[in-house]
Amino acid sequence: MKAIIAGGGTGGHLFPAIALAEELRSRRPDLSLLFVGVEGGFEASLLATRGWDFEGIRASGLQGKRLLSRLRSLTLIPSGLIRSLSILRRFRPDVVVGFGGYASAAMVLSGVLARVPTVIHEQNALPGLANRWLGRIVDRVAVAFEEASEFFPKSKVRVTGNPVRAELFGVSRAEAATRLGLDPNRFTLLIFGGSQGAHRLNQAVMEALPMLTDERERIQFIHATGPRDLSLVRQGYDALGCPAVVEPFFQAMAVAYATADLCFCRAGAGTVAELCALGKPSVLVPFPFAA
């Protein structure tokens, strides 16, 4: 069996795709799988550490950009489609699965044009325009939420939920805390804002930290800041003498989850699925421009 999984740009698209890939590999040892994502995106290095083959497409989003940036993004569409068709001809997959992200639409559309079976997975309750359009022409649509079904042809829809990586389970708190250099008996707050970080969450924590005068003696922190705020946040914890592990991004998220008593994070669909599966108490902050 040969499959292409297309998606990336953010962890919300990539990690459910990885979960599916790992499950397929466990069920089909003969599986030959290729990930396709954004050229130069964070997914390339992350997938390489996991041993997955990857090819990149030049692509960029349109939403929320200035006019010139949008025009530049539009010029990448033809080259992205040509590149996708080239990948398809060389790899000859039995199926193409799209998980969203800038590169996913081009790859899935190429699959449709080449008459390869195609599937898209919609992680959110309110699908974006690209998936709504693709839903009309692909063979199957998998949705995480029942509410999303109304945006697609009923005969194509299957409610699957959001895939969660098996690696997140089975790590003990003691082992995880030791790997992070933290105290397994101390209350641990895990803060993260998705694969790119969340500036407002980082800012809110830094503003609140000085107010925790008594609690700081009993709390330790794990904080994924994103690349932008790394130095600022590290300095904030150091200035107050707070035990904290601060990184731009945690590839070993299983270790962070296993150590955490409480999560303070963005309410991304993939994150919520992981928190529910792990039974982690959480304070969720929705991103105002997503559903």
Predicted regions and their residues:
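Donor-nucleotide binding loops and adjacent catalytic segments primarily
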Residues: 36, 41, 46, 50, ...
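Short amphipathic alpha-helix
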Residues: 13-25
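Active-site-proximal region of nucleotide-activated glycan assembly enzymes
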Residues: 53, 112-174
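Glycosyltransferases and closely related glycan-assembly transferases
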Residues: 83-96, 104-119, 132-140
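Short alpha-helix at the nucleotide-sugar/activated-sugar donor binding site of glycosyltransferases
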Residues: 112, 135, 257, 275-276, ...
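Acidic donor-binding loop of glycosyltransferase active sites
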Residues: 93-95, 250, 254, 258-271, ...
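Structural loop-to-beta junction motif characteristic of Rossmann-like glycosyltransferase folds
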Residues: 52, 116-117, 261-262, 279-287
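Conserved nucleotide-sugar phosphate-binding/catalytic loop shared by glycosyltransferases and other
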Residues: 2-8, 27-76, 227-229
